[in-house]
A protein has these predicted regions:
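C-terminal catalytic domains of large/alpha subunits in multi-subunit enzymes
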Residues: 1-128
């Protein structure tokens, strides 16, 4: 369970704060799903064991905490009116930050996603 999510973003001149905030929140939610839950599982012959959403674990709204978002006060000479692209940049730092938090908690840094509770338990036991 993720208890708190705080994200800093450099979007240059933020022309539409609500839209930019939504972009960051969506990217963080997607990244939490990728870091903790989502995994394509294969059988021994290479067949997909998780072909439908009933068997493929994705985060629910209850799995995603509110995200505090702080925008850096910068400007970009190349962007329109000083804006920078946000696209999916919020996605990139989430898994490494979570891996560092897990290392701080149990002394071992996971190097594989998803960082499921089973994998974390094995890491903590020295099994992984």
């Amino acid at each position: 369970i993720v208890l708190q999510s705080v994200h800093a973003a450099d979007a240059g001149t933020v022309m539409n704060p609500q839209q930019c905030l939504g972009q960051v929140e969506g990217g963080v939610a997607q990244a939490i799903g990728s870091a903790l839950y989502e995994e394509i599982m294969l059988d021994g012959a290479g067949g997909v064991l998780t072909p439908v959403f009933r068997t493929y674990r994705m985060p629910q709204m209850a799995d995603i905490p509110d995200t505090e978002v702080y925008f850096a006060d910068t400007s970009d000479d190349l962007g329109p009116y000083g804006a920078k692209s946000m696209s999916e940049s919020p996605f990139n730092p989430v898994a490494p930050a979570m891996a560092n938090a897990i290392r701080r908690a149990i002394g071992v840094r996971p190097c594989e996603t998803p960082m499921s509770r089973d994998r974390i338990w094995r890491l903590a036991q020295g099994i992984a």
